[in-house]
A protein has these predicted regions:
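Conserved small/polar residues in nucleotide/adenosyl-binding loops
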Residues: 1-2
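Glycine-rich adenosine-cofactor-binding loop
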Residues: 16-34
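NAD(P)-binding Rossmann-fold cofactor-contacting core
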Residues: 29, 35-59
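Rossmann-like NAD(P)-binding element
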Residues: 46, 55-113, 121-136
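Small-residue helix-packing motif on alpha-helices
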Residues: 51, 71-72, 87, 222-226
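Rossmann-fold dinucleotide-binding core
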Residues: 105-197
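Active-site-proximal catalytic alpha-helix in oxidoreductases
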Residues: 162-217, 223-241
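NAD(P)-dependent Rossmann-like dehydrogenase/reductase catalytic/cofactor-binding core
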Residues: 217-332
Length: 332
């Protein structure tokens, strides 16, 4: 675990130009934080909506904002923050612009770990490093603005210069990390993909929907089912679990809630662990990567994805949420 020493980071990176390729949530959050802390950072984009957003955020064309290939050629640390599909598409150009002793930086191990599918294999004369914030790009930015920072993992995949660790850790704090813990590219991507499919998103949606449907099938109104399934969890209990831990929550709830949670948690553990183990195996085997890459390469993928997302959007559960969220006290 490392604590931030920002002046030391500035010294390490004083002769570096960080080129951020991509301006999605991570590119934007990391770039703005680096700029605010006085590091030399440029953005590389194709002209379009992301380019316009970058201009609105104060990046200056020809000074700190360049087209992707130009930025790649100017950078000494290339932060490769395009989507997984975008990284595959742009890799030949990026590889051609890597110079000896450059650093290639990722915030996700997908491209490197699943190189058989992505074809992303860096040359041996560059550092290959990773900093993976444990939150969305928006959280990277808002935590930094609040003076908190965000926890991040870091990894060294290839140390061609002997300076990869220093460059990695300095950049981690430059983007707004508060604390760091070491991992590997493999462990990062395996845990990240499993988390997204399970407790962070996939399983969470499934669990919310299952409880909501049971309550509705037994006569509860949409508002009651939503409040007891989602609103209380997200607005009251989960923030306390984050702040104090589940052990504290168990010790500070009603005796009825305490007894029920203690009795039912093992049943959920027994039911869910095999599903999570199946998911983890699918991730580590490369099956999930293959599914993602093959899906993204289909001509009609975007159209079908929009249909899937619209189906979630139209679920009664989330329609109830849209009606109830404006009624929170802070919104009245």
């Amino acid at each position: 675990m490392y604590k931030r020493q920002i002046e030391r980071c500035r010294e390490i990176l004083k002769d570096e130009t960080t080129a951020i390729l991509g301006y999605g949530p991570q590119g934007k959050g990391q770039g703005l934080n680096m700029r605010d802390q006085g590091f030399k950072v440029i953005i590389g984009l194709r002209k379009g909506r992301s380019w316009d957003r970058a201009l609105e955020d104060g990046w200056v064309e020809g000074e700190t904002l360049f087209e992707t290939e130009e930025a790649a050629s100017r950078g000494t640390i290339i932060q490769y923050l395009l989507s997984d599909a975008g990284q595959i598409q742009m890799w030949p150009m990026v590889k051609a612009n890597l110079k000896s002793s450059d650093a290639l930086y990722f915030s996700h191990g997908f491209g490197i770990v699943f190189h058989e599918h992505t074809q992303i294999v860096p040359p041996p004369n560059v550092d290959v490093i990773l900093v993976a914030p444990k939150g969305s790009g928006l959280t990277v930015r808002t935590h930094f603005q609040a003076g908190r920072g965000i926890n991040s993992s870091y990894a060294i995949h290839q140390d061609a210069t002997g300076r990869a660790r220093d460059r990695c850790i300095a950049t981690a704090f430059a983007i707004g990390s508060g604390h760091l813990f070491e991992t590997t590219f493999e462990r990062e991507v395996h845990s990240d993909l499993t988390g997204e499919r399970c407790v962070l998103m996939g399983m969470l949606q499934g669990a919310f929907l299952a409880q909501y449907e049971v309550l509705r099938e037994n006569g509860h109104s949409p508002s009651e089912a939503y409040n007891e399934t989602i609103e209380e969890a997200l607005e009251s209990l989960y923030p306390l679990v984050s702040e104090k831990g589940m052990d504290w929550m168990y010790s500070n709830c009603s005796t009825t809630a305490q007894r029920g949670a203690l009795d039912w948690a093992p049943k959920f553990h027994k039911a869910l662990k095999p599903v999570i183990a199946e998911c983890y195996s699918s991730v580590t085997s490369g099956k999930e990567a293959q599914i993602s890459i093959e899906s993204n390469s289909k001509a009609d993928y975007r159209e079908k994805l929009e249909q899937e997302l619209e189906a979630v959007n139209n679920q009664e559960m989330w329609q109830a949420g849209r009606q109830l969220r404006p009624l929170r006290p802070e919104n009245l």
